[in-house]
Amino acid sequence: MPDIGVLYIVSTPIGNLEDITLRALRILKDSSLIAAEDTRQTKKLLNHYKIHTPQMSYFEHNRFKRIPQIINHLNSGKDIAVVTDAGTPGISDPAYKLIRAVIEAGCRVEAIPGASASITALSASGLPSDRFIFEGFLTSKKGRKAKLERLRTIEATIIFFESPKRINKTLNDILEYFGDRPAVIARELTKIHEEMIRGKVSDLLSYFTEKTPRGEFVIMIGKDDPNVFF
């Protein structure tokens, strides 16, 4: 019976293709298969580094089909690398469901660290990083207001992801529930048009009311503390 393969959780660049580790490149090259959230997006990275490993799509809506296939592949002794479109798989990403299933099946999981939008944004924000909460994307459905009500009481920097279509609504809601706290928005991290906007929540709302929001956003809200300011 062959040894059980390893599922490698491989972090990939969030924009700049140079932001990938030597180890990640080796794993992507040596694995027998890459499970990618969007194979077209991952193909750009693979082509850039002349990696020819075959791909399989893995995303939220095909996971029930793909998870058994991936586990069978691992049980046959073959290693698989799982990647998301950008950043670290499993962080605000459906890969965590695959990872849980692989662990339950008795297979080995190994993380290959690298880029993460939330940590990249926080490190350059100027907000306290001794304690932070990563919330990911706020739901647009029932429970959004209750979630904000709970988060406002936490003494930590709060990190959200948001899309350009919803950025102004989310900033309005944050202003209503959190008050006019110090905040930072990181936009298009590591890309040509990277931007960090710092100020109060109301300042950021004014900025994106006057300027059409574009790109990918990380919102960071400082805790309610007079020592935290911009």
Predicted features by range, described:
Residues V6-L7, G77-A81, T157:
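Loop/turn-to-beta-strand initiation segments
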Residues I14-N16, D85-P89, P164-R166, D224-P226:
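Short glycine-rich anion-binding loops that position phosphate/pyrophosphate groups of nucleotides
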Residues K97-I154:
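Class I SAM-dependent methyltransferase SAM-binding "motif I" and its flanking Rossmann-like core
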Residues I4, T157, F161-F230:
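A contiguous loop/helix-start segment that scaffolds small-molecule binding in enzyme catalytic cores
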Residues F59, I67-S116:
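Glycine/small-residue-rich loop that forms an oxyanion/phosphate-binding "nest" at active or ligand-binding sites
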Residues L28-I34, G106-V109, T157-I158:
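Short active-site oxyanion
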Residues S57-F64, F137-K141:
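Conserved helicase motor
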Residues M1-H61:
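Glycine-rich, flexible N-terminal cofactor/catalytic loop recognition
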